[in-house]
Design a protein with these regions (language model features):
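P-loop NTP-binding catalytic core
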Residues: 24-91
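Short, glycine/charged-enriched secondary-structure capping and boundary segments
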Residues: 60, 110, 142-145
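P-loop NTPase nucleotide-binding module
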Residues: 77-130
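P-loop NTPase switch/communication element
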Residues: 116-161, 165
């Protein structure tokens, strides 16, 4: 296992059938983006031959790679920054910047949860999340699998521009 496991096309097909509940067509929109979110908020990334139509990805065929990204939360990771995000009882406009893989999404998720739930001395507020790639709430069948707070509304797999107008 240290070197990996060589998979056959049958292994990949069987795995895709299983994670798609034997109805992959129902996940066409997600698969077009190169991944599928499963129960627990885990993401299954795929690679293969992209099918292009009008300069847009219509789908992915001949899937040759499956990458499982296990979702995890780190509640409390935003504790140290929360005092800097409030001024005069109001939440400040905030931009989170860092290199890839340093925890921006994890911190954002915890900030959302704390704002939504209300963490002393801050009041709970209504939060709207446009989760374009199911990375923040990790929705499965429309239900957030990650704790994003009790006052948070999530638009899952929604383009940001459209979602901002909907909220």
């Amino acid at each position: 296992w240290e070197k990996g496991y060589p998979v056959s096309p049958t292994d990949i097909r069987d795995t895709m059938d299983y994670i798609g509940s034997f109805s992959l067509y129902a996940y066409e929109d997600e698969l077009r983006q190169g991944f599928l979110t499963v129960e627990g908020g885990h993401r299954i990334g795929i690679a293969g031959k992209t099918v292009i139509e009008g300069e847009k990805v219509k789908g992915i065929s001949h899937i040759s790679c499956i990458n499982v990204r296990v979702a995890h939360e780190k509640k409390g990771c935003a504790d140290r920054v929360m005092p800097y995000l409030w001024e005069d009882g109001r939440f400040l406009h905030t931009l989170i910047v860092s290199a890839p893989g340093c925890g921006k999404t994890t911190m954002l998720r915890d900030i959302i949860r704390q704002i939504s739930d209300g963490e002393s001395p801050y009041p709970g507020l209504t939060v709207g999340v446009v989760d374009e790639r199911s990375e923040i709430a990790g929705c499965y069948l429309g239900v957030a699998q990650n704790d994003v707070g009790i006052r948070t509304d999530v638009l899952d797999c929604c383009p940001k521009a459209e979602g901002m107008m909907m909220l």
